[in-house]
Structures are given as C-alpha cells and as structure tokens.
Amino acid sequence: MRGVVWAARRRAGQQWPRSPGPGPGPPPPPPLLLLLLLLLGGASAQYSSDLCSWKGSGLTREAHSKEVEQVYLRCSAGSVEWMYPTGALIVNLRPNTFSPAQNLTVCIKPFRDSSGANIYLEKTGELRLLVRDVRGEPGQVQCFSLEQGGLFVEATPQQDISRRTTGFQYELMSGQRGLDLHVLSAPCRPCSDTEVLLAICTSDFVVRGFIEDVTHVPEQQVSVIHLRVSRLHRQKSRVFQPAPEDSGHWLGHVTTLLQCGVRPGHGEFLFTGHVHFGEAQLGCAPRFSDFQKMYRKAEERGINPCEINME
C-alpha cells in the first residue's frame, strides 16, 4: 500500500548507512554520494497484507528508479521475498504483542536459492553484513537482538536479466528462547549446570535416549543426529515419532553445527533444544547420569527452576 510515506521520508533525511570498515568481505556498497542520490530519488512504504510476510518485485518500479523501500511487518514469524531486486529495502520487524526490544531476538534464514542482494544489520548508519549474495550457497541462520538494529537489503549489480529472488524466513522470540541459536553460532562448548537446568524448563523438546547415527552434511555445514528416544518428557511439532516396531520408543533427528564435531557416543543422554524454521536444533545434551547428579544436587538446595520426572 503506497501513500503512507511519512516514516520513509523521515528516513530519507538521514545519511545512508555506512559500509563496514576495512578488512576481508564483499565489495562495499556504492559511494556515499551515489547512495544519497538513491535516497533522494524516492522512498516508499509497503505494508504487508497479512502483517507477517511480504512479497514484491523490482519490475514494478520505473527502469531508472533506485528507490529505498520501507517494509513493515508485525508478527512473530514470516518471510520476505523480493523478485528482481533493484535499489534497497529497509525491513522493519516488530512483534504482534507488546515486548521491549531489548528482550527480543531476531533470527533469519535465507531461502536456499536466494540471490541478487546482500542483507545487512543496520543501526544509526552503520552496516554489518549478515548474508552475502553468493548464488548456490546454503543459507545459514543468523541471529541478533532487535535493539541492535533493523534489516537493510541492498540489490547487487547484475550483468543479465535472469530471474533472481532474494528471500528469507524470520522469527522473533524472547531473548532466552533465542539463546540456543546464539550458542550454536559461537564455538561449540558444553552447557554449564545452570544452562542445563534452565534448558529443561524452556526447551521445545526434552527427551532421554541414545544416538543411533550421525550424518555430516558439509554443503550445509550441519550434522544430523539420529536419535532413539526412550523417554519423551516434552516436545512440540512432533519432532519424534513412535518407532514402527511398536517398542515403546520414538525416533527422530536433530541438527547441530558441523564444526561441533558430533560423533556417535555410547550411553544415554538427555537431549534438549528448540524448533526453528521447522528444524529441531540441539541445545544442551548432557549424559543422563551427569544430569541426574546435577538435578538432585539442585533439588536438595532448592534451586532447580522447574521439575522433571527422573524415573
């Protein structure tokens, strides 16, 4: 819907975001003067019809137009799809419930074939690259605090007119629920006792079981861990399904970063984690015997944040 442009015009009065400092990375955005001309050339606001997802095309603009388009989405999850990208988008994400920005984490996952634009985190004129325009590379999940800034999507110069689409899914969640993805994006490390005890309260799934196999997928930089579950404490989205042999067990798989170097291990574990973008992602996974000790110790001291059946 065009016509509601006051917010965009306020933006147009600001300086264009500055490119990241020197160092390895993609070519910087065009010079400041050219970018200022882009802004002055026009800006428009777009409101999604369902407030969760937006789909647009650069072909709707005049050939010489280099607009900066404002997109406003007010939802906890959705997607952005931009066909034939030209110029730039500023994507404003807000939850559909009142929640302070400092308590919210935003995670984005590029579409598998996304191409035609770079995606930056932008705040007060500074740019930090999140997703580089490299066609054919699988998109990695990127997370940041909502108070760190918004999304600036800039089309890259193209030598042909073949169809290109830049797109991504997004999720907004409380800071605590987004913790697992931040842990996964950092060097892998075992969870502390406090993190494990909190994970059993806040995770989307909490199960007890064994690792049957691990499949490494280098092209996606992930490892898929196949589990046989003996005790289902909690799950969402039906990650684990009853085993076909009707043995009282459940089967399912979770993913973690390839760099974590997960290998099949003997013994029983407690697996926790969250479901993001339809995928179960591993959080804390202590050996069950170690978990029993830390849980009982916390229970004796009265500091366990929630209860779980240990039988």
From Swiss-Prot:
Disulfide bonds join C52-C75, C107-C143, C188-C260, C191-C284, C201-C306. It is found in: Secreted. One of its GO terms (molecular function) is hormone activity. The keyword Signal applies. One of its GO terms (cellular component) is extracellular space. It comes from the Eukaryota. One of its GO terms (biological process) is response to cold. The keyword Signal applies. Residues 1-45 form the signal peptide. Abundantly expressed in adipose tissue. Keywords: Disulfide bond, Glycoprotein, Hormone, Secreted, Signal. Glycans are attached at N103. Its main location: secreted. Belongs to the meteorin family. Hormone induced following exercise or cold exposure that promotes energy expenditure. Induced either in the skeletal muscle after exercise or in adipose tissue following cold exposure and is present in the circulation. Able to stimulate energy expenditure associated with the browning of the white fat depots and improves glucose tolerance. Does not promote an increase in a thermogenic gene program via direct action on adipocytes, but acts by stimulating several immune cell subtypes to enter the adipose tissue and activate their prothermogenic actions. This is Meteorin-like protein. It comes from Rattus norvegicus. The gene is Metrnl.
